[in-house]
Amino acid sequence: MNFIFTMKKIIIFLLTVLGLNTACSQNFENIEVKEFAELINDSNVVILDVRKADEYAEGHIKGAILIDQFQNDFVEQAKAKLPKDKTIAIYCRSGRRSANAAGKLADIGYKCVNLKGGILAWKEAKMPVLSE
């Protein structure tokens, strides 16, 4: 009797852990500046900047499309502007907004990668930015 009770507890624990692991797993990849820089040279990659327009104007990665992640219609704008057959390389200021955006887009079928550290890491690595 005690053995069965213990086994039930173990099974419930394992199922809980497996369920949490699945719920918390990312459906996109976080990559470092060097790998991001190599990736964005591929013609099958679209660069997405999810910062605000004023941040974008201060400096952005060449070729980046701007869609503010804080806009209520972010997902709708992304669907209209981003091809589903290409990898979406996403960045923001520090990597937090872009991770959020990557999760949203990956949930609707996009293949996404997120720049760890965002444009701050990009600039720190002395990578080029364009200003408007």
Show the residue positions of the predicted features.
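Structural scaffold elements adjacent to functional motifs in cytosolic proteins
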Residues: 47-49
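Intrinsically disordered, low-complexity boundary segments flanking structured domains
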Residues: 17, 52-54
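Sec-dependent N-terminal signal peptides
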Residues: 10-19
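Rhodanese-like catalytic fold shared by cysteine-dependent sulfurtransferases
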Residues: 2-10, 24-39, 45, 54-87, ...
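Short, surface-exposed ligand- or partner-binding patches at beta-edge/loop junctions that are enriched
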Residues: 91
